[in-house]
Amino acid sequence: MTVRQLVEMGIAYAQINNAELARRLGWSPQLLNKRLNTGKFTIEEWENIAMALGAEFRIGFTFPDGKQI
């Protein structure tokens, strides 16, 4: 799954569109599209995207023994 696909699935589930997500982030729709094309977001931006979608952002590592960090 690409970054664009992940964000677009979140947009669809939140029942908004790209322009509304951009507005909630304080970005222009053009900037959101550019960032979706590059697929490069900081952790803080991922947190903001999740908040704008009404979701929780989680990131971490799960090791073969089940340890999660």
Predicted features, each with a name:
Residues G26-F41:
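Recognition helix of helix-turn-helix/homeodomain-like DNA-binding domains
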Residues G54-I69:
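Short C-terminal boundary/hinge segments that cap the last helix of small helical domains
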Residues E20-A22:
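Short alpha-helical "recognition helix" segments of helix-turn-helix
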Residues Y13, R24, A52:
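Residues within the alpha-helical elements of helix-turn-helix
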Residues M1-I16:
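A short, Lys/Arg-rich alpha-helix, primarily the initiator
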